[in-house]
């Protein structure tokens, strides 16, 4: 074996809180307590007021850091009805009850995400 292979073999992955999916943080507001339904509604209203296009993504908690998230349908281009956006979040929850769910506001003027936030974390 080469010296590099010996060093790699000796590296150990020690368990830590980073191995616990419940301890991981994702996107804006992730270090705050879980938002209430009314607080999520206000964030959606903000996204709509900025003219951003909402989109929903979901992913298994254990894959959320190192993998791409799944897009729920297509981004909701031009959608301004907050209740329709909430209904899509709820539909995603029903179809993927064990997944994390993220709401994104795409800013098509700046060609970037205006915001992204976790709106659902499954009970573990």
UniProtKB/Swiss-Prot annotation:
Any Pfam family: RuBisCO_small
Gene3D superfamilies per UniProt: Ribulose bisphosphate carboxylase, small subunit
Family the entry assigns: Belongs to the RuBisCO small chain family.
PANTHER family: RIBULOSE BISPHOSPHATE CARBOXYLASE SMALL CHAIN 1, CHLOROPLASTIC
Other noteworthy facts: The basic functional RuBisCO is composed of a large chain homodimer in a 'head-to-tail' conformation. In form I RuBisCO this homodimer is arranged in a barrel-like tetramer with the small subunits forming a tetrameric 'cap' on each end of the 'barrel'.
Role description: RuBisCO catalyzes two reactions: the carboxylation of D-ribulose 1,5-bisphosphate, the primary event in carbon dioxide fixation, as well as the oxidative fragmentation of the pentose substrate. Both reactions occur simultaneously and in competition at the same active site. Although the small subunit is not catalytic it is essential for maximal activity.
Name listed for the protein in its UniProt record: Ribulose bisphosphate carboxylase small subunit
Native species: Hydrogenophilus thermoluteolus (Pseudomonas hydrogenothermophila)
């Amino acid at each position: 074996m080469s010296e590099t292979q010996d060093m790699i073999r000796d590296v150990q992955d020690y368990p830590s809180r980073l191995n616990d999916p419940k301890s991981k943080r994702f996107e804006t507001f992730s270090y705050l307590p879980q938002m209430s339904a009314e607080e999520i509604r206000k964030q959606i209203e903000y996204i709509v007021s900025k003219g951003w296009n909402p989109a929903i993504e979901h992913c298994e908690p254990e894959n959320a850091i190192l993998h791409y998230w799944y897009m729920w349908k297509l981004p909701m281009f031009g959608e301004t009805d907050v209740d329709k956006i909430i209904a899509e979040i709820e539909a995603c929850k029903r179809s993927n009850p064990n997944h994390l769910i993220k709401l994104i506001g795409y800013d098509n003027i700046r060609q970037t995400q205006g915001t992204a936030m976790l709106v659902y974390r499954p009970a573990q």
